[in-house]
């Protein structure tokens, strides 16, 4: 979904940067508070950043002035929330723009709003709604990750349609065209990403459940049930 350098008009680049900045500020404040409380969170933050960087660098071509790929934001969103994810995602997008020519500096605001902010907010909402229910935590993780992924591309389609409305049908026609093209690759990718993140959480819960408990991601009872189910599968 990385919109390439120079593809958006300057006015829209400025708009998306202005929308992104408050989330970055809030995320930085939260990060500083977290680091003062416990610097042991740093390794997991690094893992979250690497997860986003690697998955979002796996590009599939798309004919929308962009590309399709997993976003990888689900892990950070569930563990740290969407504001911290905005900062982690912004750092990833900056490195990708400078080192991989993936996205751009002028369009970084738009890319942040879609991948580092909008998608994570949607994924976090799904996680919070399902967290305290009886639904299996791996299903919760799967859906939160998949929704964060697909909403990222809905927002990217929205951004592109605002910048380039169709001559016939205007914004809605343009939005439908952009997202229908993205959906061909992105719906399967979002499902795959959800499965991958569920497996990652299964690994963490089996080996280092105290990380999940310390961050209050899931309750001790939920983790115990998940570990018991995992042990039963092995047996």
UniProtKB/Swiss-Prot annotation:
Family: Belongs to the CbiM family.
Pfam families the UniProt entry points to: CbiM
Keywords assigned: Cell membrane, Cobalamin biosynthesis, Cobalt, Cobalt transport, Ion transport, Membrane, Transmembrane, Transmembrane helix, Transport
Keyword Transmembrane helix among UniProt keywords: yes
Summary of subunit composition and partner proteins: Forms an energy-coupling factor (ECF) transporter complex composed of an ATP-binding protein (A component, CbiO), a transmembrane protein (T component, CbiQ) and 2 possible substrate-capture proteins (S components, CbiM and CbiN) of unknown stoichimetry.
HAMAP family, per the entry: CbiM (MF_01462)
GO cellular component annotations of the record: ATP-binding cassette (ABC) transporter complex
Localisation per UniProt entry: Cell membrane
Membrane topology reported for the UniProt record: Multi-pass membrane protein
MF annotations from Gene Ontology: cobalt ion transmembrane transporter activity
Name of the protein: Putative cobalt transport protein CbiM 2
Transmembrane segments annotated in the record for this chain: 9-29, 41-61, 80-100, 107-127, 135-155, 160-180, 181-201
Pathway: Cofactor biosynthesis; adenosylcobalamin biosynthesis
Disulfide linkage: none
Main location: membrane
Gene Ontology biological-process annotations: cobalamin biosynthetic process
Physiological role: Part of the energy-coupling factor (ECF) transporter complex CbiMNOQ involved in cobalt import.
Organism this protein belongs to: Methanosphaerula palustris (strain ATCC BAA-1556 / DSM 19958 / E1-9c)
